[in-house]
Regions:
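Ligand-binding loop in jelly-roll beta-barrel domains
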Residues: 2-20, 126-145
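C-terminal amphipathic alpha-helical segment
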Residues: 22-95
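Conserved hydrophobic/aromatic beta-strand scaffold that supports enzyme active sites
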Residues: 2, 11-13, 77-79, 97, ...
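Short acidic-glycine-tyrosine-enriched beta hairpin
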Residues: 1, 109-128
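Glycine- and acidic-residue-biased ligand/ion/polar-headgroup-sensing regions
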Residues: 8, 82-110
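A generic structural signal for well-ordered coil/turn residues at beta-strand boundaries
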Residues: 8, 71-76, 94, 118, ...
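Hydrophobic, well-ordered secondary-structure elements that form the walls
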Residues: 80, 103, 119, 139
Length: 145
C-alpha cells in the first residue's frame, strides 16, 4: 500500500502482515549511523497495481450499531458510532479488534471495566463471547470473515 501520512490523520491499515517495506521517499531522514535510508523506487513501482478501482461507497452510520464498511473473503470492517451502550454477542468464530478513532469508550466484561481512548487498539479473543461497549466514540470493529 502506497501512502503518505500527514499530521492529524488517522490511518487504519488492515492487511496481512509482511516483512517487506519499499520506500519511495523518506524525507531525507537518517538512520542511527547518520546515513539516509535506502529507497526502493523501482521495486515499489513494479509492485503497484495501477488498475483503477471504483470502490467508493457510502455506508450506514446508525448509532450504537455495527455498520459494515468492508466485507471481503478475508475480513470484515465495521464502523460503530457509539453514543451510549452497545451489547456485543460474539459468535466465537473469530477474534475481534476494536480501534478507537475518536472519543473514548469502556469495554465491560465479567465485571471488569477496560478503558480506551483515541488511538488505542484492543484484541478481543474469540472466547470472550458477551460484553458491553460504553461511551461516546467512533470505533472500527474488525474480524475474520
Amino acid at each position: 500500500t502506497v501512502h503518505a501520512i500527514g499530521a492529524g490523520l488517522v490511518v487504519a491499515e488492515i492487511q496481512q502482515t509482511s516483512d517487506i517495506t519499499y520506500r519511495l521517499y523518506d524525507f531525507d531522514r537518517k538512520d542511527a549511523q547518520g546515513n539516509t535510508r535506502e529507497l526502493h523506487v523501482d521495486l515499489a513501482l513494479d509492485a503497484i497495481n495501477y488498475k483503477k478501482v471504483n470502490t467508493y461507497k457510502k455506508y450506514s452510520r446508525e448509532i450504537n450499531q455495527s455498520n459494515t464498511v468492508v466485507d471481503c473473503p478475508y475480513f470484515t470492517t465495521n464502523f460503530i458510532p457509539l453514543e451510549n451502550v452497545k451489547g456485543v454477542e460474539n459468535s466465537g468464530l473469530s477474534f475481534v479488534v476494536y480501534m478507537c478513532i475518536e472519543g473514548s469508550f469502556e469495554l465491560e466484561y465479567d465485571g471488569i471495566i477496560y478503558k480506551y481512548i483515541k488511538g488505542d487498539t484492543v484484541l478481543i479473543p474469540a472466547a470472550m463471547k458477551s460484553y458491553n461497549l460504553k461511551g461516546k466514540a467512533s470505533i472500527l470493529e474488525i474480524y475474520i470473515s
